[in-house]
Amino acid sequence: MGLSMAPKGKYEQSHWAIKVLQWVGSVLLLSMFAAGSIFFFEQPLSINALKWVQFIQSTAMFLLPPLCMAYLWSKQPLDWLKVKGERLKVKGESLWAVMLMLVALPAINLLGHLNQQMTLPTFLEPLEQWMKTSEESAKVLTEQFLNVTTFGGLMINILLMALLPAVGEELTFRGVLMNLFRVKGKRLKVKGEGVPHLAIWCSAILFSAIHMQFYGFVPRMLMGALFGYMLVWTGSLWIPILMHFTNNAMAVILYFVALREGWDMEQVDAIGTNDTLWLGIVSMVITIVGIYAFRRSTTMSNASSRISSGN
């Protein structure tokens, strides 16, 4: 039976392992179709063609599978994904989320700098060399994508490198995978409140690993965990999506401005490290305090809402 004919929530009661297989199968199947898109462009691929391929592959891997799975696994798919319309009404939480990501930029740079100091044992030298080569290849391709100086090119890059990954990856890692891990894993208790730590950290590790950028693994994993906790605290996937978008869009816009103004991008990336190490430390402290304050604020707000509703 085709997806269009399948009733909502048809596999809602399916075993956890069956759902995992369905999700993996949908990703593989759609990715295979997306991979075929490369043959519709002239070879060798131009940067514009590569951007089209990236758009198609990102949509196939991260955007469509979560939507399909949510439809098959729940009678209320948007609510299951935590993206239902009323969840947009998050008041000041959106501003909190954006400010946190802006303040955290030097701290993210510092964590990335520390991550890059990682060295593997001598017997793993071939693996380390492969990791460095992969990292450099990814960096070169990213810089080619970002190498635009027109506002039209900037808008395309924001769509391709900020908006699409933010929506697709959050639907995948916080929407689907965190839900699956949450069902399978045992809930740990923190001060009497159920918080799915296992689900949050497992999805965060996979989120970082899928990028195949090993020297940025730690900061990306920590961001993934933060996005997971934000989802739990607010009950809305739109907050992690907004934070993810803010982080990616900042990088795209900074690179664009650097090209137009002739800035040294390496110095921009080094903010919070070396000569500005103090800024990275201050940023980290403010970010941690901000996260704690956000959690207290949302906890109190949720408690107030429950009292007002008579629960």
Q: Language-model features: where?
A:
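Alpha-helical transmembrane segments in multi-pass membrane proteins
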Residues: F33-K75, E93-L102, T122-T133
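Hydrophobic core of alpha-helical transmembrane segments in multi-pass integral membrane proteins
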Residues: S26-S37, F62-C68, M101-A104, L277-R296
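Juxtamembrane helix-loop-helix connectors linking adjacent transmembrane helices
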Residues: L50, W80-L164, V183, S309-N311
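C-terminal membrane module of polytopic membrane proteins
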Residues: F245-N311
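Membrane-interface helix/loop boundary segments of multi-pass membrane proteins
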Residues: G168-C202, Y229-S236
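Functionally important transmembrane alpha-helices
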Residues: W201-I271
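Transmembrane alpha-helical segments in integral membrane proteins
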Residues: L63-S74, L154-F181, I286-S297
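Hydrophobic alpha-helical membrane-insertion segments
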Residues: W23-A34, L95-T119, V232-A249
